[in-house]
């Protein structure tokens, strides 16, 4: 943890090991730098930025991952290569992932492969609810060209599962490559709880030091910053931020 002034000069710094519960390590580091600058000076802090590899660690360690339903929209196409075809078994097991295929999707020029089957999506929602899945990743063929089927699928799922149920849409995650976009979306859906816990812990640590009016950001893969709400929706955008966090 560091404190930097308006001229980008280092004012205070400390290093603390990552802890299993996230909160205690963040609190310890935060308290140390606040102690170094003093409570009066700390009241002048206007921005707080967190760079973390907690999401990366969760994938590597196969821990704390959401139970994911992977919904592929593309039948009768997309059956040649199964969902998560070359994933490590231990990662799939850690996510307790199950894949579903429903009719829908688009061609490269936006034409429908087939009409979106809302009945099939409602059946998926029933399984998700009954089997305790914690998030859904929706991937439709060529959704970066036309995202209508993904958005409608998400709307149907929320009608059945509740407005706040975590749903990832692949058109918001990746580009045209179908399998790459699907894989990234599934990982994003698996990281919702990790991202929420990390962000909430950071805000709680700030509050414990009386820093309740600061603007809070998290670092993302390209070295830029994103809001807390954005990070909670798209935790996949933090998994390669280790190197950019370390640039001095």
Predicted regions and their residues:
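N-terminally biased helix-coil "hinge/interface" segments that flank
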Residues: 1-248
């Amino acid at each position: 943890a560091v404190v930097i002034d308006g001229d980008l000069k280092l004012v205070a710094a400390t290093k603390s090991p990552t802890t299993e519960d996230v909160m205690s390590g963040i609190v310890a580091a935060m308290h140390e730098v606040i102690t170094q600058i003093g409570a009066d000076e700390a009241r002048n802090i206007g921005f707080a930025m967190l760079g973390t590899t907690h999401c990366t660690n969760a994938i590597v360690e196969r821990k704390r991952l959401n139970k994911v339903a992977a919904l592929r929209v593309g039948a009768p196409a997309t059956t040649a290569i199964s969902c998560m075809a070359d994933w490590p078994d231990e990662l799939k097991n850690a996510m307790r992932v199950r894949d579903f295929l429903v009719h829908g999707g688009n061609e490269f020029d936006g034409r429908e492969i087939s009409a979106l089957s809302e009945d099939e999506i409602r059946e998926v929602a029933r399984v998700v609810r009954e089997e305790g899945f914690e998030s859904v990743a929706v991937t439709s063929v060529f959704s970066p060209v036309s995202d209508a089927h993904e958005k409608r699928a998400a709307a149907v799922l929320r009608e059945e599962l509740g407005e706040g149920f975590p749903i990832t849409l692949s058109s918001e995650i990746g580009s045209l490559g179908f399998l790459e976009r699907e894989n990234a979306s599934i990982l994003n859906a698996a990281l919702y709880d990790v991202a929420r816990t990390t962000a909430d812990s950071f805000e709680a640590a700030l509050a414990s030091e009386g820093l309740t009016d600061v603007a809070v950001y998290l670092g993302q893969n390209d070295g830029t910053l994103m809001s807390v709400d954005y990070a909670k929706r798209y935790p996949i955008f933090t998994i390669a931020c280790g190197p950019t966090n370390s640039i001095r």
